[in-house]
Amino acid sequence: MSAPSNKMSATDQMRAMLDQLMGTTRNGDERQLKFSDPRVCKSFLLDCCPHDILASTRMDLGECPKVHDLAFRADYESAAKTRDYYYDIEAMEHLQAFIADCDRRTDSAKQRLKETQEELTAEVAEKANAVHGLAEEIGKKLAKAEALGEAGEVEDSMELMKEIEELRAKKIKAEHEYRTSMPASTYQQQKLRVCEVCSAYLGIHDNDIRLADHFGGKLHLGFLTIREKLIELEKTAAPRKAELKRTGKMTDREDEGRGRNRYFVGGRELDRRSRVHRSRSRERQRNRDGDRERPNNGRGPEEKGSERPKEAADGPERAERAPDRGGRRDDRDNHGRDHRERERDGRRDRDRHGRNDRGRFGDRGGGGGGGGHHRDDRRRSRSRERSPRERRNFNHFRDGGGGGNGQRKRSYSRERNYRR
């Protein structure tokens, strides 16, 4: 029985312990979700889910997509005494998928080292493997001796330390043979190898403390626990699975369906989810770009024409929306053209009215005095500075100078033209 997590509060720990001991019906109420529900993690019921074993490590898989509840485990343990649910078969398939992905990463790391590191001869490679083997054995025994010392078994820990001293002497001899079999410059380079259990990198020059930390670490021990549990399940669950298939209780179709609903862990599934996420993001971006109106930015007709095949190539939806955007651009162009024509007609009318007024005042000014002529010029210059609305009822005055009697006359020509 596993203990509750230390990160939980005291109340949560007591609640979890009661659930684990008494099951889901400890309060007398029936829960809708049962341990037999497909949403419940069957590997968790057997205490071998990789999401829990590798939690808070470098290979942390995050939260399991299925439900983990200690109360379900208690219900399963009590119900499994009277009935066989064959959950060990599903847990075995789960761990097989996980270990297969781990082995794939190990092979990939080995291939990467083979491409980056210098190729060694068969004799030198054999000596290097001997050094690595002794170093791994020392690290494992040292980690075990530390665990025994913490548990209070001092005598067993001292016996392991004696064995470690013998292995260290063998390692020193093997390192000397490895050093003399290759050039000094090549020996100084860091030679790495991949751990067969957790696919981590190990160096040939790592000291005993570094190796003990690795082999006694949570990551390596977690992978070791998963592999040992898989070996145990394959001994018991694999024959049961073959027997079910032989008797017809488990058809091939049910086996394939369970394979489709298998837990996805590791690099392949993460890569697949990443590809799906990127494709969906690109599709959403294309839809937003299609709905958004894009300005022309002053480009000519040749540049706009060159973009039409690109829009059509992006997808049928953008190709269908392209004529609509062109229609909206035409409407904006027509509106601007009409506005410019109206402004041009207004300027022409104002210029024509100004010429008519200058001709009228010049004829009436005749051979009169110069003072009246200058006053008319000042009035006309001030009238041009005013807007048409301000000028339409303007009273033009005329002083005939020597030829007129100085009478005031009003001109209604601009008002009549404006009303037209």
From Swiss-Prot:
A GO molecular-function descriptor: mRNA binding
Keywords from the UniProt entry: Coiled coil
GO cellular component, one term: U2-type prespliceosome
Biological process (GO), any one: mRNA splicing, via spliceosome
Residues forming coiled coils: 99-130
TM spans (from-to): none
Keyword Cell membrane in annotation: no
Pfam families according to UniProt: LUC7
Positions of the UniProt region annotated as Disordered: 242-420
InterPro entries xrefs: Luc7-rel
Compositionally biased tracts (Basic and acidic residues): 242-259, 282-363, 373-399
SUBUNIT field: Interacts with x16 (via Arg/Ser-rich region).
Role description: May bind to RNA via its Arg/Ser-rich domain.
Family: Belongs to the Luc7 family.
Protein name: Putative RNA-binding protein Alsin2
Gene: Alsin2
